[in-house]
Design a protein with these regions (language model features):
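N-terminal/domain-start alpha-helical segments
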Residues: 1-105
Length: 105
């Protein structure tokens, strides 16, 4: 068993989504670190290790697809894309860039 709770990087620019997801995760004992834009997500990822990344696609500064692409250049951390974009092409692109799963809000 791990010495620390699993650490999740939750990346979404909507406060309501952040609150909706982070509360139950924290209640279950996960360490949730939040980022509100793509640049902040990449900075947080460089600062500490994560066990999972939950990533929105439509983000300010750097979009979620680019964040995913950059993370995949040096990490195999599981990435779940959580987005309002429900077109099949969006899912295909996200998975091809290295996301492990794609969930529509």
């Amino acid at each position: 068993m791990a010495d620390h709770p699993a650490r999740i990087l939750l990346v979404d620019d909507e406060q309501s989504v952040q609150a909706l997801l982070s509360y139950p995760l924290r209640k279950e004992g996960y360490d949730v670190v939040q980022a509100t834009d793509g640049r902040q997500a990449l900075e947080r990822f460089e600062e500490q290790p994560f066990d999972l990344v939950v990533l929105d696609l439509m983000l300010p500064k750097i979009d979620g697809l680019e964040v995913c692409r950059r993370l995949r250049t040096h990490s195999s951390v599981p990435i779940i894309m959580l987005t309002a974009k429900s077109e099949e092409i969006d899912k295909v692109v996200g998975l091809e860039l290295g996301a492990d799963d794609y969930i529509t809000k």
